[in-house]
Amino acid sequence: QVPQSAALRTALGCTKMTDLGHLHSECKFLTVEEHNKMLAKQFYLSTKQTGHANFSIPYQPPSRIMKQSLATLYEDEIQGLYTQNGNNAAQHKIGLRAIHTEAVAASIAAAPPNKVLQLPAPEISQSESKLPRSARSTLSQLRSGYSSSLMQYLNRIKLNIYDPHCPRCGTVPHDTPHLFNCPANPTSLNTLDLWSNPEAVADFLDLVP
């Protein structure tokens, strides 16, 4: 998981303080554990195809589980995805898709609330893809709540150097919500626009040269 998290941070341009939930929400990646479980279920489902070498070996629940296997772990979960006579190629593809859909839905349901919104993170508008990488990285940082554009964050990592007050109005904390509520820089935009209207936010924050 550590190498994957580091790669996602690099791809997004986020800070080391950024939580795992934000990284996976932004990149739409399953965690390593979730992905491995999904692949294990899909592999076990493949043994239910008529042409598979293990198809002729029926599953029999052990009287006592001494050691977990794919069968003891996932048999109950995939029972509805195959027939006793075995799956053909079309049925197998449908089963693989169902396992993938279930894994993604479970990951989304288990995701922690976004730290800025205190709610599940909504979908990011496709319009963000039109922005340069530097602007998209800053927007992702702001959605995480940890950004070098925020005095609160800079004060947290270098307490004796940076002041947590807003450089425009002098109030604290200078965090992501404050950017849209600063009396010295009024706007009709709000925090949700970081997701729904990233182009307008990038323009408001002068992120695009």
Task: Label the model's feature ranges.
Residues 194-208:
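Intrinsically disordered linkers and flanking regulatory tails adjacent to Zn-binding modules
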